[in-house]
Amino acid sequence: MAYSTREILLALCIRDSRVHGNGTLHPVLELAARETPLRLSPEDTVVLRYHVLLEEIIERNSETFTETWNRFITHTEHVDLDFNSVFVEIFHRGDPSLGRALAWMAWCMHACRTLCCNQSTPYYVVDLSVRGMLEASEGLDGWIHQQGGWSTLIEDNIPGSRRFSWTLFLAGLTLSLLVICSYLFISRGRH
């Protein structure tokens, strides 16, 4: 079955919230799941495999993720639109790659984790951020469909395999693009 990027990312954020949260699902994720009924469970094999892959990307690049997120979240009034702006910067030439897609998904999962696990984050910031990342991510659907879907892309990326290591390497390189885009985005000013 072909899943949308929105469905995959939401299932990943819910899965990640269960793994790293305090045992409860953030109300924003509950609402998003009601608004976009999931055709796959956060416990689905595809979600679990992507979660392992993205966790590895986040772990290997934790300083980059933290620094980029801290710069990004300095102003929150239009954070939903800011996600779209960063997405456009990363994929501006219309030439997505698996590395770019995974770096984007890992960054979004990290952002969701950071927001949902911090009890002092205002509800509206979490809401705007989750909505922004889910909506921006829909821009990957055409390319993902051309590649055979999210399920096909993960089939050969089994932890410990050579392809898994190569995918991690490419995603790590792509993170440099994410950092550059966030710096450009911030230095140009917002809106």
From Swiss-Prot:
Q: How does the entry describe its membrane topology?
A: Single-pass membrane protein
Q: In which broad location class does this protein mainly occur, judging by the first location in its UniProt entry?
A: host cell
> What keywords is this UniProt entry annotated with?
Apoptosis, Early protein, Glycoprotein, Host membrane, Host mitochondrion, Host-virus interaction, Inhibition of host apoptosis by viral BCL2-like protein, Inhibition of host autophagy by virus, Membrane, Modulation of host cell apoptosis by virus, Transmembrane, Transmembrane helix
Q: Where is this motif: BH1?
A: 89-109
Motif BH2, residue numbers? 142-157
Q: Where are the annotated coiled coils located?
A: none
Q: How does it assemble?
A: Interacts with isoform 1 of host VRK2; this interaction is involved in protecting cells from apoptosis. Interacts with host PRA1; this interaction seems to modulate BHRF1 anti-apoptotic activity. Interacts with host BCL2L11. Interacts with host BAD and BBC3. Interacts with BALF1; BALF1 acting as a negative regulator of the survival function of BHRF1. Interacts with host BECN1.
Q: What is this protein called?
A: Apoptosis regulator BHRF1
Query: Which organism is the protein's source?
Result: Epstein-Barr virus (strain GD1)
